[in-house]
Design a protein with these regions (language model features):
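N-terminal Rossmann-like NAD(P) cofactor-binding module of classical short-chain dehydrogenase/reductase
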Residues: 69-72, 95
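Mid-domain Rossmann-like dinucleotide-binding core that forms the NAD(H)/NADP(H) cofactor-binding site
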Residues: 1-53, 57
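A glycine-rich helix->loop->beta "capping" turn
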Residues: 62-70
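C-terminal hydrophobic helical "lid"/dimerization subdomain
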Residues: 10, 38, 53-54, 66, ...
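ADP-ribose/adenylate-binding Rossmann-like module
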Residues: 86-103, 117-121
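Residues in the short beta-alpha loop(s) of Rossmann-like NAD(P)-binding domains
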Residues: 27-32, 100, 124, 177
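Rossmann-fold NAD(P)-binding glycine/threonine-rich loop
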Residues: 78, 97-116, 127-134
Length: 198
């Protein structure tokens, strides 16, 4: 899985649920402190630092060339798509969830030569939503580890800065003094935001 944001972290969890043996999260140096530990908590078996490691070589070592049949690309970076295709076995699939806006500067001829597929995914139908809620309700999908910050609206700059420097994954803003949950439960005892049993 390329990309350490919420989409990538959810993809790791779906891979775990589907029974993947090796689930590799690929990120950058700035992901090592916060996002890699969360990836391991939610189901990644390995994390690869693309800032320091040869991603294709390392993922191939971990999984074995013949087992790299599915890569989920959530970053939108062209280099991630290139590396995804390079490591992918013949007849494998890259699911492209991340959005990139720069033109590709590499050949994709080997998707024809080796019968590889790139599948774009963006839309969600009612079936997807129902399945997502079912997985959340059952506890199979973990959301809480991704909520790294809870801040009052007066600290919005701090929240945006944390997102920009990747020290946060998801930031939840609440009303400052008037917030019902904070007034009732206190800042440190905010109730579960995803309680689907009510």
């Amino acid at each position: 899985v390329f990309g350490t944001g919420p989409l990538g972290l959810f993809a790791v969890q779906i891979a775990r649920i589907m029974g993947a043996v090796n689930i590799v999260m690929v990120g950058l140096e700035e992901d090592v402190e916060t996002r890699f530990p969360i990836a391991m908590e939610v189901g990644a078996t390995h994390c690869v630092n693309a800032s320091k490691e040869d991603v294709v070589k390392r993922c191939t070592e971990i999984c074995g060339r013949d087992n790299l049949g599915l890569v989920i690309e959530c970053s939108g970076a062209n280099i991630a798509l290139k590396q995804s295709l390079e490591m992918l076995r013949p007849n494998g699939e890259v699911i492209r969830v991340g959005m990139g806006f720069k033109p590709l500067e590499f050949s994709i001829n080997n998707i024809t030569e080796l019968n590889k597929s790139i599948i774009g995914h963006m839309a969600y139908d009612s079936t997807s939503w129902r399945e997502s809620i079912r997985l959340l309700k059952s506890g199979a999908i973990k959301v809480q580890p991704m909520i790294t910050h809870r801040l009052g609206l007066s600290k919005w700059k701090e929240g945006f800065a944390a997102m920009a420097d990747k020290s946060a994954v998801k930031v939840i803003f609440h009303y400052d003094e008037e917030d019902k949950d904070v007034a009732e439960f206190g800042e440190e005892e905010t109730p579960n935001d995803y309680d689907f049993n009510d």
